Amino acid sequence: MQNLLPYIKNNLNPMLAQILLQALQNSNNEKFFTFVLENIEMICTWLNSSEFRDKYLSTKHPYPPLINPEFIETDASRHCAELAWDLNLPLPQHYKFIYISPHGVGAAAFLRYLNQCCDVICFASWCLPADAKERYCAHYMCLNDNAISQYAINISEVNIPYFDKYLSLLDFDSKIICGVRDPIGILKHCWGRDWSKVLRNYPSEFNLTYDWRYYIHYLTHKSNEIKINIEELQQGSFILSSLLKHFNKDKVYYLDMEEISQSKALNTMNSLAFKFDFTPPHNEHLALFRIKEFRGYIRYLFPITLYANSKDIHNTFYLNTPKNNKNFNTDKISSIPVILDRKHINPQKIDIIQEIIKNDLCDDMGVYIDKDDFEKVKQNELLFSTIKHYLRDFLHEIKITIDETESKMMKEKDVIDYFEKNKSLIHTFFNIFEDELSHLKQKCPNIIASWKYYNKFLKLYQG
């Protein structure tokens, strides 16, 4: 480093030197320091070039690349990804699009369609580490992986470390799919659900002796007091105004949540596949379009695994034998795993739910068993009938509970009623909505006009 500083001083003007020194100061990656030492001449040549001046200095790019991103050899390794981050290299630009999804606009359903029906890999941002560098590295490795032919990037929150740098390393001219929804519906989603369910405080594995009513208790909805946190809403649910300034707004396509409802989703995905050049939904995956993503709280219950074992048959829990002898030592080795999960495609497993129940719950979940295990369990009629009886009772109660939850859950009308009773909040949220929806109003006034409850809110504001 002692020899590096004089070289930088002699070969870069103070402004360019500060760019390089700031990057070194921001990193704790020894491999980055070594790279700079070994390639300092190339770095200085690039920083002094007219191309660097015209592309990055004149545009006041906050994180300009320290080497020419057009002439580098890279791969899908973690090493290259971390080095690229420290060098401020933009992410490779061959992702199909960026999907901006404020909390509550149907992102879970849309991402399911992309990943499972259209062969587009797009990780839900809320499942990635809450660190912009880690997200950048994950995307960088995937975009350099030759085995991944269709990739998209999801952004659904803004309150993560180094997020400004992350955004600056995305292409300004990226194609954008921006999820939107009647903001009263967004508030209903945020205020009306018990988000403590996300913590999943229940065992994920059980056996035939387990009292499944504990899961039913978890699924049971409890109305909670509305707690308004404006900062939290603006970091997760009303994020468009802060995000879109980082991109070319002419490249933004607005996707109203209504267009991915169960009746419209298939046509919408076919249309988007043509517009954004990705694989349209496969015919064999059409059952996935019948899923209601947020039906009660089953989204947060599954997956759970029943380990079915003949040794537990005589102590199986039923509603009429609640004081059965519980087996707290589940034998995973000699048991057959039966997985309760949301509906999905897995060629290695068989979904046996329709051997257990025949109602609309079959659209939203499956009961999965390995093909080899299915052949085994069919040979053991007593075990198979016990599994089906145990799960039939369990699934029956699941349906009752989630249907009751749906009926009790907050509705858009309840949000409007809340504003009528708390008029002091109307002006605050009017300003939030105006800021959030300013570009949408210019580009897609038809979407705004279709929002029944937002327009009711405007009438409240107007008095």
Task: State what each model feature region is.
Residues N3-P6, N10, A17-I19, A23-H285, I291-C362, V367, A449, ...:
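PAPS-dependent sulfotransferase catalytic domain
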Residues A109, Y113, I239-S242, S271, ...:
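Amphipathic alpha-helical segments that form well-ordered structural scaffolds
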